[in-house]
Structures are given as C-alpha cells and as structure tokens.
C-alpha cells in the first residue's frame, strides 16, 4: 500500500475524514515551505499538497496566482522542489502530493520526473490540465515508479467521466466543488452533499473535495459527505499577511481549527 492508501485506511479505522492542506512550494521561499509543511502536519493536516508554481496557472484564482508569482520570483524550480521533499522525508512521513500543470513536467521529461519524484519521496502527482485521456505516458511512468496519479472530477462530470477517472486514478479522486477557478467562497453549494454522495458511490478510491472551502464550518459540512476536505486559498492568504514565526503560528492555529471542523463533520 502507498502512504496515501495507508493514511486513508487508518483514518477510516478511526472513523475520521482527511484534512488535506495546500500551499505553494517556494512561497516566499523553500526554506519557509519546509517549516510550513512540518507545522501543517503538527497542527492536524493528514495530507499535504505542494503547488508547483507556474507562470500561467489557468485553474487558479488570484490568491494562488499571486502565491505562484512570489514562488517563481524567489527562484523556485521543479528540481529544487524535489530536493525540498527529500529534506522533508528525513523529518516526516506525511503523504505529499505535487499539484500543478503539465508544462513543467513535460519540459523535465515525464519518465525522468516520475522517477526523480518517487526517489525524492513524493507520493502522488495531480496535474490540473492533464485529463485521463491524455495521460497515458505519464500514467505509465508513475505506475512504474509506484507514484499515485490523481485526477479531477467536477460538477459537470457525467457517469462515463466518473467511470474513466475511477479506472485510471489512484490514491484518491479530487472532486472540484464548484465550476470556475480556485478561491475561498462564502458558502458551500446547496447540492454539493447530494452530488458527492452520488459520485462517491461509484468509486472505490477515497473522494476528497476542494475549491472554495475556507472555514472550519465549511470543512465540517463537506466532511459529512466526502472522505476528505482540501483547503488551499484560505491558507495561502496567510502568506500575504505574515512572515517567519508569526506565519507558522497563524497557520498552525487555523489548521487546528480546520481539523476540529473536519472531525466534527466525521461523526
């Protein structure tokens, strides 16, 4: 079993849902990211998604776009992110997902990247702009290296799309809760629970829900239906306001509150 499968299995045994936290690697620099990942885990994150900064992040709203810009300005590269994960693996076994766009992976070389990512200790890749029907080469590479490849479902995904993602995905399935780009929203969609329950019934893999979840209350509401909850933009906003030890303290407090919300929704 992979680290991700192990984590979901242990959570299920305890009757808990997963809190998945997203931050951009290299915002404001990779040394800070290393400390942030350890703090996220300490505060209650069950899995960590590291965003790979990209100059044209089409699926991301302004908060994560600005975060990506800050990371690129600090000189963050894909090889440097893999070195960061290697350092983290000396200190933590928290499952780590690299989330980003295909262009940097293509430039690196799919097979070489999958191998290097696995060697560094990455657990999974989530490539936002690579649908399963275009992912054969990368999937072959990730399968051979023991990496999970995570695909997206959206509110407009029909049953055939759900079936395709169920066949080709591994680790977990990421359900995008809203149409549009990433970003915090004031409320969860009225029909989200029913739709998530419907999709989840067609899957063997865990289903996590992300995009737009920004409060402990929303996290708890989503956790009632899903296997896990992803919080990204609401966390990334802290990087606009705080630095150093204060950033870690503020992030830790918020993640602890999110975890309590998820636990409440798990019951």
From Swiss-Prot:
Gene Ontology molecular functions: tryptophan synthase activity
Top-level lineage group: Bacteria
SUPFAM superfamilies: Ribulose-phoshate binding barrel
Involved pathway(s): Amino-acid biosynthesis; L-tryptophan biosynthesis; L-tryptophan from chorismate: step 5/5
Record-listed E.C. numbers: 4.2.1.20
Keywords: Amino-acid biosynthesis, Aromatic amino acid biosynthesis, Lyase, Tryptophan biosynthesis
Stored InterPro entries: Aldolase_TIM, RibuloseP-bd_barrel, Trp_synthase_alpha_AS, Trp_synthase_suA
Active site: 49, 60
Gene Ontology CC, one term: cytosol
Subunit: Tetramer of two alpha and two beta chains.
Role: The alpha subunit is responsible for the aldol cleavage of indoleglycerol phosphate to indole and glyceraldehyde 3-phosphate.
PANTHER family named among the record's database cross-references: TRYPTOPHAN SYNTHASE ALPHA CHAIN, CHLOROPLASTIC, TRYPTOPHAN SYNTHASE, ALPHA CHAIN
Record family assignment: Belongs to the TrpA family.
Name of protein: Tryptophan synthase alpha chain
Organism: Geobacter sp. (strain M21)
